[in-house]
């Protein structure tokens, strides 16, 4: 028998029952707390009768789900994305630009390339809707589901790609060359370059190859778009799309059947860099070619080489793998060895006719660990605009120290086995050639890697200017324009000895704060800056007006003043700015309205080019309008006892009856780098929450301390103590809502989440079984020492230095604290999960069995960390609804408690 172990107290002490107020600051309806101090005890209220959800059979639930999801498929992936602006340069033509983008084709539901024309003038009395025109003729771009190669499957997991077709493309402005991967091939077409603009769909050209396996990560050479590079079997290859010449550049991987004997890769981002740092490539073309006296050129590629011989191999065995009876992965668990990494460079000598003369593989003049002492992760890399230096953003293992370094190509020498010849090559490099650390920062919390780094063309040989974003200075990510002096190192390689940590550091000449305040500049998941070097402006996305809305802003980076917002409040925006900074596209939505995509023209007075204003120009995708049978949630906030304002969403039951109290489901993520509560449309990704509300559940979502977009102090609250604070915030939010709404039944609360949300669902049942009746945990971490280095050590530190934190944060170690009543715990997990391995669930089950605790389990044999197979997704939602119905919401669930 399950009983409430104690009468719940209302910790937040708030009793304002006023109607919703629209706050001027946020531009979105938010139900706020009041200043009243009395607690509202449950016995002070009239006795309410419980509302029981209708009990459906499995087949009835299946039909109900099908009916509620009929608009869902239409909305998924409908919005265009990955925009590219190209000037038409036609003085007499009606169009100024052509924009290219990826979107879903109506014919075969695949992502493919489209374009639209931007008119030079518009009729302001009417709304112009741009027509979508297919750039490509129809061709088979996608294999049948389940036919992706292992490499493609894993990359799609890391990038969270759920659509089919073309996932991304590369474009070269000068030649008009498009390059993209589709199905098992790499293709190219030309449009918008010297040959003009097509009016008919183009037939893609297959890049022919001798490679027997899948080719990944194709990129155009920016210095010569006839050449492309790609990854084949963990090595770098190049190919000429005109002459069809193909060459393998690196030979580090041997394609051996035994993974233990074949641990090296070139040009490939390893698992942790992809999953935890959002870096998916491991090679970078130099933007400029070096000309040779004979009329040829030298092309360069900087790449990383990884040695994973000391990284543990994880084996996943399943009959569902069909031809592969076992899948094996290199997976560095926290506290164990990461891959050994170094930079190398490939130089390709091209003759005047465009043929390869020679390829030289080069390595650093000294070992990576000597030149870059204490560096564990290559977080980002690239080249300066002139190609004079490669640059890289480097992190130490604890992720509390960041360095930006410049690396001259002169720092690399040809790979040479002969010791004497190698020494001669080393001595030929001047002592003045060393790495240059142009920026360094440290923190006692952690450093969140982002994509904001803009290097200006060098105007002085001895200086370099760049824009970077930092959280370490104020606790909020802001933009800084930094000038570093490229000072020659005092370390002399020829004199022997090792460099000191400070030998390569360059002094900072000037550092200008471009933005400031208790809000953040966005720099991940597609958000980046656009720099207008002509007008000396920087465009960025941020949360200046509200932590719940993303907006586009502009400010001068030379004389920073007031930041100008360019997008409309009341919506959350994701923007793309043209290369000439004369147009921008915004994809925007709010809680009530599905996403819409619009084009805006930017202009400024002639006497003040820094004063930017926008003008609506055209619609690219109109909003679908309110969805039938969809009721958006209400956003609320409350002042937590921790001193922070916490935000949440409340889905009320659709047929709310007075005098009734309703079963409540807390949907949770609660981990870092995610924000669930914001002013965006939730009717697509989180449609199941609306379904629950339609069945008679109250649904609550709360962003606790540790979630993103609230500053480093807010996010860093669970440093060293994951799992120890999040449920306190969630419970306080539930208690606050119960103090405002008597229809919330705190005797019938369930919790559900996936990944970190699954982990916290377990924590909730373990820590507060007096509050949570049912927990449904999907793909949960149960033992932190089983999770990867990059994520776990960032937040929890090294396990040897935080044993108590790892113990308290691991539910498997505390299985005896779970309730002893059946029908309260359901675990869901994909058997092929390569991120949070199924071992997390199996070890928890072992400890639950030892402790004599009941549980229910649902395995998805074909799924990895994300559910991809449509039938699996439907089954998961059915199981979720059925379990909640049988064990929380229905009358039969109440009888089980008695």
Swiss-Prot record:
Entry comment describing in which tissues the protein is expressed: Ubiquitously expressed, with highest levels in testis, placenta, prostate, muscle and brain.
GO BP terms in the entry: apoptotic process; immune response; negative regulation of programmed cell death; proteolysis
Enzyme Commission code: 3.4.14.5
Induction of the gene: In activated T-cells.
Cell location: Cytoplasm
Gene Ontology molecular function: any one: aminopeptidase activity
Outcome reported for the amino acid change (mutating residue 788 to E): Loss of enzyme activity. Loss of dimerization
Organism domain of life: Eukaryota
Catalytic activity: Release of an N-terminal dipeptide, Xaa-Yaa-|-Zaa-, from a polypeptide, preferentially when Yaa is Pro, provided Zaa is neither Pro nor hydroxyproline
UniProt keyword annotations, A-Z: Aminopeptidase, Apoptosis, Cytoplasm, Hydrolase, Protease, Serine protease
GO CC, one annotated term: cytoplasm
Activity regulation summary: Inhibited by zinc. Inhibited by the serine proteinase inhibitor 4-(2-aminoethyl)benzenesulphonyl fluoride (AEBSF), and by di-isopropylfluorophosphate. Specifically inhibited by isoindoline derivatives. Inhibited by Val-boroPro (Talabostat, PT-100), a non-selective inhibitor, which triggers pyroptosis in monocytes and macrophages.
Residues annotated as catalytic: 755, 833, 865
Result for mutant: residue 275 to K: 13-fold reduction in affinity for Ala-Pro-AFC; no effect on subcellular location
Pfam families linked to this entry: Dpp_8_9_N, DPPIV_N, Peptidase_S9
Activity at various pH: Optimum pH is 7.4-8.5. Little activity below pH 6.5.
Subunit structure of this chain's protein: Homodimer. Forms a ternary complex with NLRP1, composed of a DPP8 homodimer, one full-length NLRP1 protein, and one cleaved C-terminus of NLRP1 (NACHT, LRR and PYD domains-containing protein 1, C-terminus). Forms a ternary complex with CARD8, composed of a DPP8 homodimer, one full-length NLRP1 protein, and one cleaved C-terminus of CARD8 (Caspase recruitment domain-containing protein 8, C-terminus). In the ternary complex, only one subunit of the DPP8 homodimer is bound to NLRP1 or CARD8.
Entry's family note: Belongs to the peptidase S9B family. DPPIV subfamily.
Function (record text): Dipeptidyl peptidase that cleaves off N-terminal dipeptides from proteins having a Pro or Ala residue at position 2. Acts as a key inhibitor of caspase-1-dependent monocyte and macrophage pyroptosis in resting cells by preventing activation of NLRP1 and CARD8. Sequesters the cleaved C-terminal part of NLRP1 and CARD8, which respectively constitute the active part of the NLRP1 and CARD8 inflammasomes, in a ternary complex, thereby preventing their oligomerization and activation.
Name this polypeptide is given: Dipeptidyl peptidase 8
Lineage: Eukaryota, Metazoa, Chordata, Craniata, Vertebrata
Gene name in the database record: DPP8
């Amino acid at each position: 028998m399950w009983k409430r172990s104690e009468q719940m107290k209302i910790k937040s002490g708030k009793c304002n029952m006023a109607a919703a107020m629209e706050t001027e600051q946020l531009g979105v309806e938010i139900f706020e707390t009041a200043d009243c101090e009395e607690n509202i005890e449950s016995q002070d209220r009239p006795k309410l009768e419980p509302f029981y959800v209708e009990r459906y059979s499995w087949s009835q639930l299946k039909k109900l789900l099908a009916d509620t999801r009929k608009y869902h498929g239409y909305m998924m992936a409908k919005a265009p994305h990955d925009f590219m602006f190209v000037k038409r340069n036609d003085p007499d033509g009606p169009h100024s630009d052509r924009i290219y983008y990826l979107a879903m084709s109506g014919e075969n539901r695949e992502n493919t390339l489209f374009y639209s024309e931007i008119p030079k003038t518009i009729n302001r009395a009417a709304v112009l809707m741009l027509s979508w025109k297919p750039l490509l003729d129809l061709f088979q771009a996608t294999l049948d589901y389940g036919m992706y190669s292992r490499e493609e499957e894993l990359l799609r997991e890391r990038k969270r790609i759920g659509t089919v077709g073309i996932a991304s493309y590369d474009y070269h402005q000068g030649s008009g060359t498009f390059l993209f991967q589709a199905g098992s091939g790499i293709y190219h077409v030309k449009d918008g370059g010297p040959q003009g603009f097509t009016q008919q769909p183009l037939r893609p050209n297959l890049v022919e190859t001798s490679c027997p396996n899948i080719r990944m990560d194709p990129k155009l050479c920016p210095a010569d778009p006839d050449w492309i590079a790609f990854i084949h079997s963990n090595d770098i290859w190049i190919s000429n799309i005109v002459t069809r010449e193909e060459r393998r550049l690196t030979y580090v991987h041997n394609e051996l059947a035994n993974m233990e004997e074949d641990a090296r890769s070139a040009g490939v981002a390893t698992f942790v860099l992809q999953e935890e740092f959002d870096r998916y490539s491991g090679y970078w073309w130099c933007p400029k070619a070096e000309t040779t006296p004979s009329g040829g050129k030298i092309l360069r590629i900087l790449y990383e080489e990884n040695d994973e011989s000391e990284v543990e191999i994880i084996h996943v065995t399943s009959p569902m793998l069909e031809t592969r009876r076992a899948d094996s992965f290199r997976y560095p668990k926290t506290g164990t060895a990461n891959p050994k990494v170094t930079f190398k460079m490939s130089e390709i000598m091209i003759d005047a006719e465009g043929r390869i003369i020679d390829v030289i593989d080069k390595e650093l003049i000294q070992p990576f660990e000597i030149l870059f002492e204490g560096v564990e992760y290559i977080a980002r890399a690239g080249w300066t605009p002139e190609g004079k230096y490669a640059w890289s953003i480097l992190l130490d293992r604890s992720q509390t120290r960041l360095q930006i370094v410049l690396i001259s190509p002169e720092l690399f020498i040809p790979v040479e086995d002969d010791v004497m010849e190698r020494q001669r090559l080393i001595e030929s490099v001047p002592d003045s050639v060393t790495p240059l650390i142009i920026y360094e920062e440290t923190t006692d919390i952690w450093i969140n890697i982002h994509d904001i780094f803009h290097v200006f063309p060098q105007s002085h040989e001895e200086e370099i200017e760049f824009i970077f974003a930092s959280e370490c200075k104020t606790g909020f990510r802001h933009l800084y324009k930094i000038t570093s002096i490229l000072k020659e190192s005092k370390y002399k390689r020829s004199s022997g000895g090792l460099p000191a940590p400070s030998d390569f550091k360059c002094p900072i000449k000037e550092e200008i704060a471009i933005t400031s305040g208790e809000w953040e500049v966005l720099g991940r998941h597609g958000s980046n800056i656009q720099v207008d070097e002509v007008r000396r402006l920087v465009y960025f996305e941020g949360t200046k007006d509200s932590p719940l809305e993303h907006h586009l802003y502009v400010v001068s980076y030379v004389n920073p003043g007031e930041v100008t917002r360019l997008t409309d409040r009341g919506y959350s925006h994701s923007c793309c700015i043209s290369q000439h900074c004369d147009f921008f596209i915004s994809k925007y939505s709010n809680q009530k309205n599905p996403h819409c995509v619009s084009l805006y023209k930017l202009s400024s007075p002639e006497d003040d080019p820094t004063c930017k204003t926008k003008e609506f120009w055209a619609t690219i995708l109109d909003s679908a309008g309110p969805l039938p049978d969809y009721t958006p949630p209400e956003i609320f906030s409350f002042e937590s006892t921790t001193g922070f304002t916490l935000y949440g969403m409340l889905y009320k039951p659709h047929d709310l009856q007075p005098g009734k109290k309703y079963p409540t489901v807390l949907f949770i993520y609660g981990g870092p780098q995610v924000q669930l509560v914001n002013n965006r449309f939730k009717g697509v990704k989180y449609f199941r929450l609306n379904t629950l509300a339609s069945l008679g559940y109250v649904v609550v979502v709360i962003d606790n301390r540790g979630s993103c977009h609230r500053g480093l102090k807010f996010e860093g609250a669970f440093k060293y103590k994951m799992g120890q604070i999040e449920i306190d915030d969630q419970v306080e939010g539930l208690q606050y809502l119960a103090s405002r709404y008597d229809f919330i039944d705190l005797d019938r609360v369930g919790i559900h989440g996936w990944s970190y949300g699954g982990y916290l669902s377990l924590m909730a049942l373990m820590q507060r079984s007096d509050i949570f009746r049912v927990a449904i945990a999907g793909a949960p971490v149960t033992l932190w020492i089983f999770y990867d280095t990059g994520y776990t050590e960032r937040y929890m530190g090294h396990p040897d230095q935080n044993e108590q934190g790892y113990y308290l944060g691991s539910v498997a170690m505390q299985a005896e604290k779970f309730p002893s009543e059946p029908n309260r715990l359901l675990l869901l997990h994909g058997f092929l999960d390569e991120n949070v391995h199924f071992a997390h669930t199996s070890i928890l089950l072992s400890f639950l069995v030892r402790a004599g605790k009941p549980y229910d389990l649902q395995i998805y044999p074909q799924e990895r960390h994300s559910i991809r197979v449509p039938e699996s997704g439907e089954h998961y939602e059915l199981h979720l609804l059925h379990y909640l119905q049988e064990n929380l919401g229905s009358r039969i669930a109440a009888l089980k408690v008695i």
